[in-house]
């Protein structure tokens, strides 16, 4: 069986116009996949050079396959049908290592056609590293490497205004474009680079903040033999992802034309502010996950897919989304409902086995950031507590007992909560404290909740009632009235 390469698998090759920091699965099944579609259907005509930003030889370089690899996109489409689509990606030309090919890295700045910079260097990637110097070959941090590359471009083209770049980071931090820009400016000032360069950075370059959304499941280790047989070739960089994707870019309106989105519509939004889209994702997608996990797991289910195929648990989650989360969010209802519909479809994806216990990690913080704002907004708007979001809090507290049907399971959270719950549930079992007292102690933790939740009218009582129902009847019986 042949391995992918451009000699045996000839086809389109595009001039290099995009630099991408990061060789991982996410960018390959998200950014490069979208660029490939735009190259095929429009005159975008842009090839990608992947820069490996860290010093590692694993996985091997994409250049071993001349940049070629296959994406397998699978899940439920808009009609709820299971689909699987294999695509040979030709948008990546080569990969270089900034550590072993530093001169080649700097030469990327000399190419007049270069226009875009994408990156995913993990959440920790957009950070300051003290001690990074201009003459380091290379500097340690991604922002320092980018500053050096931008200065190379500025110098090579004598500060030409039309040679700036559109920089689109995909790291999962708030306002990633602003954060990256601030660090680039910090290094420029720290390294005492000319004032003209700092002005050029501001005037000729755009740093765009983004929101990225797609579950990328990566290399399908367990299915490789079968998939390669179907494809008819060997591919060491196979990359699998869900059907759904969304790319929200906070940037100039002209970006839509530059990316040719006017000629081939992708699920890419160019917006003035990503904040409402971030809130929508956190509240609906992440919030639904967080409400679902402790309820479904204690009802005897193990994966998100099983939960969504369970009529009662599915009804609980959908009612939480449509009746309690969406009404308090600040975007057009139609847009929110369309997003919610896509979310529940994603949860049902038969190709992804999303373990509830893995999503349960750090559940206390997730509840505070993802559900509490909607719970409190609902109470403020209606004068009553949203029943399902409140029940989810009771289910979460019950989850920290660490026991289901007489069997223990691992609970992962910070040490403070693990110790606290161990102590509280032990006291509860021994009859030292009652359910209402246990709930009040948890809700009074100001350092965690950033407020004293025992002051929210009726919250302690309602959570305690729900928790008693869970303890006495079991999760199935307790949740039924809310389904």
Curated annotation (Swiss-Prot):
Gene3D superfamilies, per the entry: N-(1-d-carboxylethyl)-l-norvaline Dehydrogenase, domain 2, NAD(P)-binding Rossmann-like Domain
Biological process according to GO: D-galacturonate catabolic process; mannitol catabolic process
Entry-linked InterPro entries: 6-PGluconate_DH-like_C_sf (IPR008927), 6PGD_dom2 (IPR013328), Altronate_OxRdtase (IPR023668), Mannitol_DH_C (IPR013118), Mannitol_DH_N (IPR013131), NAD(P)-bd_dom_sf (IPR036291)
Any one of the GO CC terms: cytosol
GO molecular function, a single term: mannitol-1-phosphate 5-dehydrogenase activity
Domain of life: Bacteria
Keyword set, alphabetical order: NAD, Oxidoreductase
EC number(s) per entry: 1.1.1.58
Residues binding NAD(+): 18-29
Catalytic activity: D-altronate + NAD(+) = keto-D-tagaturonate + NADH + H(+)
Pathway(s) served: Carbohydrate metabolism; pentose and glucuronate interconversion
Protein family according to the UniProt entry: Belongs to the mannitol dehydrogenase family. UxaB subfamily.
NCBIfam families in the cross-refs: PRK03643.1 (NF002969)
Family annotation (HAMAP family): Altron_oxidoreduct
Name of the protein: Altronate oxidoreductase
């Amino acid at each position: 069986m042949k391995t992918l390469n451009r000699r045996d698998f000839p086809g389109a090759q595009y001039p290099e116009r995009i630099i991408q920091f990061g060789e991982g699965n996410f960018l390959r099944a998200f950014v490069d996949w979208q660029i490939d579609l735009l190259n095929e259907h429009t005159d975008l005509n842009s090839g990608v050079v992947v820069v490996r930003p860290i010093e590692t030889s694993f996985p091997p370089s994409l250049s071993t396959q001349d940049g070629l690899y296959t994406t397998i996109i699978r899940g439920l489409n808009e009609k709820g049908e299971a689909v699987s689509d294999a695509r040979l990606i030709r948008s990546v030309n080569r990969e270089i290592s900034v550590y072993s090919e530093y001169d080649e890295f700097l030469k990327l700045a000399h190419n007049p056609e270069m226009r875009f910079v994408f990156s995913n260097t993990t959440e920790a990637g957009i950070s300051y590293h003290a001690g990074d110097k201009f003459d380091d070959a290379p500097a340690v941090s991604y922002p320092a490497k980018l500053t050096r590359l931008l200065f190379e471009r500025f110098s090579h083209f004598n500060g030409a205004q039309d040679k700036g770049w559109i920089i689109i980071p995909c790291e999962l931090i708030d306002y990633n474009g602003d954060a990256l820009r601030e660090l680039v400016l910090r290094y420029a000032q720290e390294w005492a680079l000319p004032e003209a360069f700092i002005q050029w950075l501001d005037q000729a370059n755009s740093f765009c903040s983004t929101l990225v959304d797609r579950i990328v499941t990566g290399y399908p280790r367990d299915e490789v033999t079968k998939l390669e047989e179907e494809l008819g070739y060997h591919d060491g960089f196979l990359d699998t992802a869900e059907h759904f994707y969304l790319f929200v870019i906070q940037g100039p309106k002209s970006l839509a034309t530059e990316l040719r989105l006017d000629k081939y519509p992708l699920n890419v939004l160019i917006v003035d502010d990503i904040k409402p889209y971030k809130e929508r994702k956190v509240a609906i997608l992440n919030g639904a996950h967080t409400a679902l996990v402790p309820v479904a797991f204690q009802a005897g289910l193990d994966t998100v897919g099983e939960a969504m195929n369970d009529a009662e648990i599915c009804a609980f989650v959908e009612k939480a989304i449509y009746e309690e989360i969406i009404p308090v969010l600040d975007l057009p209802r139609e847009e929110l409902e369309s997003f919610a519909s896509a979310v529940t479809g994603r949860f049902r994806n038969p190709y992804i086995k999303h373990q509830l216990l893995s999503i349960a990690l750090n559940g206390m913080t997730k509840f505070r950031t993802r559900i509490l704002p909607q719970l409190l907004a609902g109470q403020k708007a209606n004068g009553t507590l949203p029943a399902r979001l409140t029940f989810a809090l009771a289910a979460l507290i019950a989850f920290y007992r660490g026991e289901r049907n007489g069997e223990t399971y691992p609970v992962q959270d910070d040490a403070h909560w693990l110790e606290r719950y161990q102590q509280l549930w032990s006291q509860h079992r021994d009859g030292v404290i009652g359910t209402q007292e246990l709930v009040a102690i948890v809700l009074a933790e100001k350092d965690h909740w950033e407020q004293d939740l025992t002051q929210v009218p009726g919250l302690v009582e309602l959570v305690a009632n729900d928790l008693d129902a869970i303890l006495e009847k079991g999760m199935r019986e307790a949740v039924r009235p809310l389904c």
